[in-house]
Amino acid sequence: MSSLSKEAALVHEALLARGLETPLRGEPLARDTRKAQIEAHMTEVMRLLNLDLSDDSLVETPSRIAKMYVDEIFSGLDYANFPKITIIENKMDVDEMVTVRDITLTSTCEHHFVTIDGKATVAYIPKERVIGLSKINRIVRFFAQRPQVQERLTQQILVALQTLLGTKNVAVSIDAVHYCVKARGVRDATSATTTTSLGGLFKTSQNTRQEFLRAVRHHV
């Protein structure tokens, strides 16, 4: 991964060190190669499902799926797509909680390859560095654009921000609907799953933790 940005490499190494990286096989194939091979395999899957790929509604489906997988919903598997990060010196000496609520995310369950649809709340208490607010949203999106389990996703966002900000004082909460529960199996259309990962003062200080949890509930 020698061509990656410094920030992407640091985050990847931090996740590997903590055993939190998504299981990956090594260097990814070239983008066009991935698309071509996924298209070929998806063509075979659709034929096995007895679908007529000569139909004008289906003929482009394998190609569309290949492009969607590589360029969109699984683009976070490739650290070349890690967002450009703006880290700013904390010249104003901000030492209070910074919270971004209701970050929309769409991910994919790695067990059944169906949708996870949810929102994230992310907070941190700055030390020497602050981050452009939109970059938090982009980091959430990057890690969501992978086959995921929600628990790992929550921790990946936490560790990425801790690494980039140089502080343990980060908290992440995700509330999401899993379509592997909603659309198959038990088919529960109303349940949601909440996961929380806390670091630094968010873990050790009851007051700080409660302030964050109130923000998650919008009771601020």
Curated annotation (Swiss-Prot):
Gene from which this protein is expressed: folE
Source organism, top-level taxon: Bacteria
HAMAP family according to UniProt: FolE
Catalytically driven reaction(s): GTP + H2O = 7,8-dihydroneopterin 3'-triphosphate + formate + H(+)
Signal peptide: none
Pfam families named in the record: GTP_cyclohydroI (PF01227)
Pathway: Cofactor biosynthesis; 7,8-dihydroneopterin triphosphate biosynthesis; 7,8-dihydroneopterin triphosphate from GTP: step 1/1
Binding positions (Zn(2+)): C109, H112, C180
Molecular function terms, GO-annotated: GTP binding; GTP cyclohydrolase I activity; zinc ion binding
Any Gene Ontology CC annotation: cytoplasm
Protein's UniProt name: GTP cyclohydrolase 1
Its EC number(s): 3.5.4.16
Presence of the UniProt keyword Nucleotide-binding in the record: yes
Alphabetical keyword list: GTP-binding, Hydrolase, Metal-binding, Nucleotide-binding, One-carbon metabolism, Zinc
Biological process, per Gene Ontology: one-carbon metabolic process; tetrahydrobiopterin biosynthetic process; tetrahydrofolate biosynthetic process
